[in-house]
Amino acid sequence: MTPVRMQHSLAGQTYAVPFIQPDLRREEAVQQMADALQYLQKVSGDIFSRISQQVEQSRSQVQAIGEKVSLAQAKIEKIKGSKKAIKVFSSAKYPAPGRLQEYGSIFTGAQDPGLQRRPRHRIQSKHRPLDERALQEKLKDFPVCVSTKPEPEDDAEEGLGGLPSNISSVSSLLLFNTTENLYKKYVFLDPLAGAVTKTHVMLGAETEEKLFDAPLSISKREQLEQQVPENYFYVPDLGQVPEIHVPSYLPDLPGIANDLMYSADLGPGIAPSAPGTIPELPTFHTEVAEPLKVDLQDGVLTPPPPPPPPPPAPEVLASAPPLPPSTAAPVGQGARQDDSSSSASPSVQGAPREVVDPSGGWATLLESIRQAGGIGKAKLRSMKERKLEKQQQKEQEQVRATSQGGHLMSDLFNKLVMRRKGISGKGPGAGEGPGGAFVRVSDSIPPLPPPQQPQAEEDEDDWES
């Protein structure tokens, strides 16, 4: 016969020691006692082994902490008598894992040894006959829990409740000069208006609806001053630092370093959010990754492309002799000499690379202004000289127009000259602005030489080519 095991009383309980049933045969009782004692021995052995393992684990943790403490103490003893400045780096966070290990029971994973199959024993003795008298005697000895307390009656909702024990007469029970029992039904009796019945619910509603007296600020029309909210934010403050007048060098002081060198690389202060001076950042010279590609010919900037060709001339002018190639050469040479002279001039010191190496017409104009000395070094001229120069230029233009009128190339040359003068500010279409660096720059640019008269020896094939 197998022993009956007790039910688990706690959630997660692993072990359950069986108890021995009464009224068993002798052999059966002895077998169950032996099995229960053997089971109890296994359970106690497992419990003590787990406790010893947990104690060993805790002892190893305490030993590791002790080693850390001894190491820190040895470091402190080593630097205690030193007079050299030591910089200590401390982490802002405690060196511990971000998530702590949860506590686990020492009985996790334990198995109940009672679940194992045990050998079955065969008992030869027979059961004793049932005795009714003995059974009745056992029932008398066992305590039986019987509830003798009567169930509470529902409280009356209309009356005052149960009758008190100190009532001695009927007159003290009934309402004065009436036959109303207030403990059964609570009423307000008025001889003129009649009896008005009120229950406990109505009385509770009256008490709940009653308001308290108004505060003094409302009844006396007083005004409360608005309270200033307190600021609970942390505001760092260095405070008042006491001034100590001591000599600059204090030799042979115990526990004081003698090689302190205060510099700006000590790191942030104790109040990093306090306002402080911003250190000056170093300047970095940035360079362009890919320089601008400028079309150069023999180290000289190429002139801008020529204007579009004019419309075809009438047939009368088409039969004119062509322009010899020697006339175009001086023009190109003069432009190249002008560009080479401007490029060969010394560059301004400290100017950026894009300004020193211009890549367009505006850059060339700025470079010419810079070489001329700017507005501060420009020489101003009087209005009389400028008017005389303009009159001379107009006379020269009229002479050229009369001497070279009717020729295709001369007309084209005159148009180019007028265009250059209009751009430089000398033409009739330009505004009469004040003199300055622009006038000086425009004067420094030489005009194109006048075209030579065409020779009769050239053929028309050269003009067409």
From Swiss-Prot:
Region (VCA): 349-465
Consequence of changing W463A: Impairs retrograde transport from endosome to Golgi apparatus
Region: Required for WASH complex assembly, residue numbers: 1-54
Region: WHD1, residue numbers: 1-167
Keyword Cytoplasm: yes
Disulphide linkage map: none
Cross-link (Glycyl lysine isopeptide (Lys-Gly) (interchain with G-Cter in ubiquitin)): K220
Start-end of Acidic residues biased regions: 456-465
Entry GO MF terms: actin binding; alpha-tubulin binding; gamma-tubulin binding; phosphatidylinositol 3-kinase inhibitor activity; ubiquitin protein ligase binding
Cellular component, GO, one term: early endosome membrane
Segments of skewed composition (Basic and acidic residues): 382-398
Biological processes annotated in GO: Arp2/3 complex-mediated actin nucleation; endocytic recycling; endosomal transport; exocytosis; extracellular matrix disassembly; negative regulation of autophagy; positive regulation of cell migration; positive regulation of pseudopodium assembly
Keywords: Actin-binding, Cytoplasm, Cytoplasmic vesicle, Cytoskeleton, Endosome, Isopeptide bond, Membrane, Protein transport, Transport, Ubl conjugation
Domain WH2 as annotated: residue spans: 361-383
Annotated region described as Disordered, given as residue ranges: 297-359, 376-407, 423-465
PANTHER family: CXYORF1, WAS PROTEIN FAMILY HOMOLOG 2-RELATED
Family: Belongs to the WASH1 family.
Further information: WASH genes duplicated to multiple chromosomal ends during primate evolution, with highest copy number reached in humans, whose WASH repertoires probably vary extensively among individuals. It is therefore difficult to determine which gene is functional or not. The telomeric region of chromosome 9p is paralogous to the pericentromeric regions of chromosome 9 as well as to 2q. Paralogous regions contain 7 transcriptional units. Duplicated WASH genes are also present in the Xq/Yq pseudoautosomal region, as well as on chromosome 1 and 15. The chromosome 16 copy seems to be a pseudogene.
General function of this protein: Acts as a component of the WASH core complex that functions as a nucleation-promoting factor (NPF) at the surface of endosomes, where it recruits and activates the Arp2/3 complex to induce actin polymerization, playing a key role in the fission of tubules that serve as transport intermediates during endosome sorting. Involved in endocytic trafficking of EGF. Involved in transferrin receptor recycling. Regulates the trafficking of endosomal alpha5beta1 integrin to the plasma membrane and involved in invasive cell migration.
Subunit structure: Component of the WASH core complex also described as WASH regulatory complex (SHRC) composed of WASH (WASHC1, WASH2P or WASH3P), WASHC2 (WASHC2A or WASHC2C), WASHC3, WASHC4 and WASHC5. The WASH core complex associates via WASHC2 with the F-actin-capping protein dimer (formed by CAPZA1, CAPZA2 or CAPZA3 and CAPZB) in a transient or substoichiometric manner which was initially described as WASH complex. Interacts (via WHD1 region) with WASHC2C; the interaction is direct. Interacts with VPS35; mediates the association with the retromer CSC complex. Interacts with FKBP15.
Designated name of the protein: WASH complex subunit 1
Organism listed in the record: Homo sapiens
